[in-house]
Regions:
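Short substrate-entry loop that stabilizes the transition state in hydrolases
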Residues: 44-89, 152, 164-165, 188-190, ...
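Short beta-strand/loop motif that positions the catalytic acidic residue
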Residues: 180-182
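A domain-start/cap signature at the N-terminus of enzymes
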Residues: 17-50, 59, 70-73, 99, ...
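Short, proline-enriched alpha-helix->beta-strand connector loops that line the catalytic pocket
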Residues: 173-178, 249-253
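Sec-dependent N-terminal signal peptides
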Residues: 4-14
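Cap/lid segment of the alpha/beta-hydrolase catalytic domain
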Residues: 83-106
Length: 286
């Protein structure tokens, strides 16, 4: 299937119908078959940027995730991996939840290997590869940022959290651009954190403190704050956009505080895919 698709991609100018594709592929890492979907928009060019989108806890390969529409307009590829089943039988990313203890799946390694595979076999950019994800996928973004990986140039967790164990046991080896989007009324991934593990997901940090770690790590010396009304005028939500910048390193940190927002991708409040792509594009290599 993959080889056939590659041939069709080369013949794309002959047929628009063949140019825009959603294909499924897989590779084996540490004995596990790792599946993924890949969206390649109409007219995509060789060495185009690549964005990974990670589903939430219990999720599946999501063809209608917030990045697809943006990718169709902007010409980048979107890879949507499938998490493996954890000890509770739920597809997920191994971020060290208490009930994942003893689970040997290394998703930092698996996603890095997958990115290298996709870059090579689908002729996509090695330099401009980025990572975003929702909830459990957002936690995976933070874990990747803390890890000694060189694959993902920037990360954008949505409703993501920094587990206390990450902050305690890991030391980020280098600055990395980070963009968090989070609702203040999120009762699944609490804005105020859960240091006592009352929710059963493990202890995790308050969102402003978790983001503040990266502000300090990236040595962002300037903050710009702007209040923006949400797209849905009926729900009363508004967004406080915190942008922390470092002109020397270029490793910015953004936090979109969705006031009144709950546990979601916030597509009713902002153009989530466009905002994330705007952040990633700002950090692309030439």
């Amino acid at each position: 299937m993959k080889r056939l698709f590659s041939l069709l991609l080369l013949l794309a100018p002959l047929s628009t119908a063949l140019a825009q594709q959603f294909v499924e592929d897989s590779l084996k890492v540490d004995g596990y078959v790792r599946r993924f979907g890949l969206f390649l928009p109409d007219g995509i060019k060789a060495d185009a940027p690549l964005v990974f989108y990670l589903h939430g806890y219990g999720g599946r390969i999501q063809r209608d995730n917030p990045m697809i529409e943006t990718a169709s307009r902007e010409g980048f590829a979107v890879c949507i991996p499938q998490g493996l089943k954890d000890p509770k039988g739920k597809p997920s990313w191994n971020v060290g939840y208490p009930f994942q203890e003893g689970w040997k799946v290394d998703d930092v390694k698996s996603l890095s290997k997958m990115a290298a595979y996709v870059q090579k076999h689908y002729h996509l950019s090695r330099e401009n590869t980025f990572l975003t994800g929702m909830s459990n996928g957002g936690e995976m973004c933070y874990l990747m940022a803390y890890s000694k990986q060189k694959t993902f140039k920037a990360v954008a967790p949505i409703a993501g959290l920094t587990m206390v164990w990450m902050y305690r046991d890991l030391e980020a080896c280098k600055p990395i651009p980070l963009f968090e989007i989070h609702g203040t009324e999120d009762r699944t991934s609490e804005w105020t954190g859960d240091l006592d593990n009352k929710g059963g997901w493990g202890a995790y940090m308050p969102v402003p403190l978790a983001v503040g770690y990266w502000v300090a790590k990236n040595r962002c010396m300037k903050e710009e704050t702007e209040r923006v009304e949400g797209l849905n005028k009926d729900n009363g939500h508004y967004i406080i956009q915190h942008r922390f910048t470092n002109s020397a390193t270029g490793c910015d940190v953004w936090l979109y505080e969705v006031v009144g927002g709950k546990h979601s991708t916030h597509t009713e409040d902002i153009k989530t895919g466009d905002e994330i792509w705007s952040f990633f594009k700002k950090h692309m290599g030439k």
